[in-house]
Regions:
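Extended hydrophobic secondary-structure segments that form protein cores and membrane-embedded regions
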Residues: 31, 121-123
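Redox- and metal-dependent alpha/beta enzyme cores, enriched for Fe-S-associated oxidoreductases
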Residues: 1-112, 144, 148-150
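Short, glycine-/small-residue-rich phosphate/pyrophosphate-handling segment
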Residues: 113-117
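Glycine-rich beta-strand-to-loop/alpha-helix junction loops that act as flexible
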Residues: 60-62, 123-128
C-alpha cells in the first residue's frame, strides 16, 4: 500500500514537471512526509512510557504494520525488555512462554518471560489494532501471571 501511494506521487510529480517545467515544480507540487494522528499519538505516548522504565513493554499489533514495528523499535532502543505480539495466541499461559517478533522481523520464543513478583508492564498497540486483540493480550498476561504465582506457591 505504501509503495502504491509512493508510485502515484511519483506519477503526479512527473506530470507536474511536464506541464509546468522542472524550474516551476515547487510552485505546483509539494511532498510532505506525514503520519496519521493515531500513529503520532502512539509514538509520542510510548516515548513517555519508556521514560518511566517499565519492567516489560508489550507491543500489540500486526506483524506487517510499519507503525507497530516502530513502537517495538522505540522500546528496544530504550533498552526495555519488550515483546511484540500480533495475537494473544502467542502467549502460552500455562508454560510461561511467549513467541514474539523483534522490530527487525526476527521471530523469537522466550521461556519464563513473565517473572514472579510485582512488576510494571507498559502496553501499547499499533494504530489499526482492534481493541479486542489488545483485550485478549491483556487477559493472557493476567492469566500467565496467575499461573506463575500459582506455580511458585507449590
Amino acid at each position: 500500500l505504501k509503495g502504491e501511494t509512493e508510485a502515484i506521487g511519483k506519477l503526479f510529480e512527473r506530470t507536474m514537471m511536464e506541464k509546468h517545467g522542472v524550474q516551476n515544480l515547487g510552485e505546483h507540487y509539494l511532498v510532505t512526509d506525514t503520519i496519521c494522528d493515531a500513529t503520532q499519538e502512539r509514538q509520542d505516548a510510548i516515548y513517555k512510557l519508556v521514560d518511566e522504565k517499565p519492567d516489560i513493554m508489550m507491543i500489540v499489533g500486526g506483524f506487517n504494520s510499519s507503525n507497530t514495528s516502530h513502537l517495538q523499535e522505540i522500546s528496544e532502543d530504550a533498552n526495555i525488555t519488550s515483546f511484540w505480539v500480533d495475537t494473544a495466541d502467542r502467549i502460552d499461559t500455562e508454560n510461561n512462554k511467549i513467541a514474539w517478533r523483534t522490530s527487525y522481523g526476527e521471530m523469537r520464543e522466550t521461556e519464563n518471560w513473565l517473572p514472579e513478583g510485582k512488576l510494571t508492564i507498559g502496553i501499547t498497540s499499533g494504530a489499526s489494532t482492534p481493541d479486542k486483540v489488545v483485550e485478549d493480550v491483556l487477559e493472557a498476561i493476567f492469566m500467565s501471571k496467575a499461573e506463575t504465582a500459582a506455580g511458585s506457591a507449590l
